[in-house]
Amino acid sequence: MRLIIKNDSCEAGEYISQVIKKRINDYFLNRKSGDNRPFVIGLPTGSSPLPIYKRLIEMNKNKEISFQEVVTFNMDEYVGLESNHKFSYHYFMWENFFNHIDIKKENINILNGTTDNHENECKLYEEKIQSYGGIDLFLGGMGVDGHIAFNEPGSSLSSRTRIKTLTRDTIIANSRFFNNINQVPTQALTVGVGTIMDAREIILIVTGHSKAIALYRTIEEGVNHMWTASAIQMHKKSIIVCDEDATAELKVKTYKYFKQVESNSNY
């Protein structure tokens, strides 16, 4: 596991944007003749990835990267919100990313939170991921309690896509988007920790002092289902990109180690 420490959230977003650009461009550069498999990426919502999406949009407009052969799978969606609801993750992704890049609509995959059969929706989502040969890169964020996607504390670290009841802490944290805590849905469909761990590469963005304890638990303590993001310690190719504020709880030795190790590293 790598830890990349940047000065602020803008620098962290820029770094991750460059990684994504390199991974996508390298994939198509090295793809064998006759192989039509697209690049498959998992995507999050929330405030943390916004600088990343903004930068990728700029790169796309400048023709530094194309999404025409990229397939996306979003991490989660609220149960009960229509796709055109302004607080749904469908709406968020189209408003902040998909409407501004050259991606094909049929290559966009987001869980349907209004389906009558949640179990079947989740089963089909897993099957569709596998039909593409798995996810090449999963981009994610981290909650203040160390959750990844909507895999709340106590979630199985081998879990697959399913319906989850949200914790009070998550509901409170997400109420800033709804302006009223009573409007925040109490359930969501989410990819599982196991689904994320199956990706060939995982990148987490962690910014802000509020994430400091979660980052400490994820990096310096053992793998623990009460801090689901800690599972990435077991992944063979994972990167956490954070800002200085998020390192507040790390030991000085840990901080210096990663700063030294990554000082001369590339993407």
From Swiss-Prot:
KW Hydrolase (keyword) present: yes
A UniProt-annotated Pfam family: Glucosamine_iso
Catalytic activity: alpha-D-glucosamine 6-phosphate + H2O = beta-D-fructose 6-phosphate + NH4(+)
Molecular functions per Gene Ontology: glucosamine-6-phosphate deaminase activity; identical protein binding
Active-site residues, Swiss-Prot/TrEMBL: 76, 145, 147, 152
SUPFAM superfamilies per the UniProt record, alphabetical: NagB/RpiA/CoA transferase-like
Function: Catalyzes the reversible conversion of alpha-D-glucosamine 6-phosphate (GlcN-6P) into beta-D-fructose 6-phosphate (Fru-6P) and ammonium ion, a regulatory reaction step in de novo uridine diphosphate-N-acetyl-alpha-D-glucosamine (UDP-GlcNAc) biosynthesis via hexosamine pathway.
Classification via PANTHER family: GLUCOSAMINE-6-PHOSPHATE ISOMERASE
Name of the protein described by the UniProt record: Glucosamine-6-phosphate deaminase
The species this protein was found in: Dictyostelium discoideum (Social amoeba)
Taxonomic classification: Eukaryota, Amoebozoa, Evosea, Eumycetozoa, Dictyostelia
